């Protein structure tokens, strides 16, 4: 039976992870290791300035107190889950992780940590907060496909599911990340003691939502599957940077 480490960034009791855990447990061995609270936007942060403790809930799920999604996967793979899991699944996230969202997403970061530790990894997000069961069924289908036809690309699959009943989903599309306009909104107010308080505003509007993007696929009713990689090297830019250094007469010396 496939051993799955299931995590998220919305917190261990969030509806997305609980619906997905219930669906996966029908056919797989699932261990939930997730933050004890909402850690959306935590990206790939690791906790290095203090110790971490865990709490095992009545249903066997493990919450990491004050931990990030990356902490949860790191601890789960390296210490808490025995035998070692065979795949990391992150989600179901409440809301999409499209375009630039992947930079900040704790959901994607949890999957990325799983891949960094040598495991296949899926990040699952729902473009809303109603049809978690649809996203759970899509995840089960993807896992069945991975078992019958293994994917050897070594990538993270970032999966975004339209917030629709399953029968209204049109199919799968392999996509690239689109992009958003830069977010600039900041909300502020003054507390009774005169201190200024600030809240970061919503993400920017869509900028690149062309036909091959994750934005377009989800908007048209398709499940978007975007392969992501841990290696952030911009290989096509290496020659440009070498030429730039040569023109600046640096020649590789400081």
From Swiss-Prot:
Transmembrane segments: none annotated. Its EC number is 3.1.3.5, 3.1.3.6, 3.6.1.11. It is found in: Cytoplasm. Its main location: cytoplasm. The keyword Membrane does not apply. It catalyses: a ribonucleoside 5'-phosphate + H2O = a ribonucleoside + phosphate; a ribonucleoside 3'-phosphate + H2O = a ribonucleoside + phosphate; [phosphate](n) + H2O = [phosphate](n-1) + phosphate + H(+). One of its GO terms (molecular function) is metal ion binding. It comes from the Bacteria. Keywords: Cytoplasm, Hydrolase, Metal-binding, Nucleotide-binding. A divalent metal cation binds at residues 9-10, 40, 93. SUPFAM superfamilies: SurE-like. InterPro entries: SurE (IPR030048), SurE-like_Pase/nucleotidase (IPR002828), SurE-like_sf (IPR036523). Its cofactor is a divalent metal cation. PANTHER family: 5'-NUCLEOTIDASE SURE, 5'_3'-NUCLEOTIDASE SURE. HAMAP family: SurE. Nucleotidase with a broad substrate specificity as it can dephosphorylate various ribo- and deoxyribonucleoside 5'-monophosphates and ribonucleoside 3'-monophosphates with highest affinity to 3'-AMP. Also hydrolyzes polyphosphate (exopolyphosphatase activity) with the preference for short-chain-length substrates (P20-25). Might be involved in the regulation of dNTP and NTP pools, and in the turnover of 3'-mononucleotides produced by numerous intracellular RNases (T1, T2, and F) during the degradation of various RNAs. This is 5'/3'-nucleotidase SurE. It comes from Photorhabdus laumondii subsp. laumondii (strain DSM 15139 / CIP 105565 / TT01). The lineage of its organism: Bacteria, Pseudomonadati, Pseudomonadota, Gammaproteobacteria, Enterobacterales.
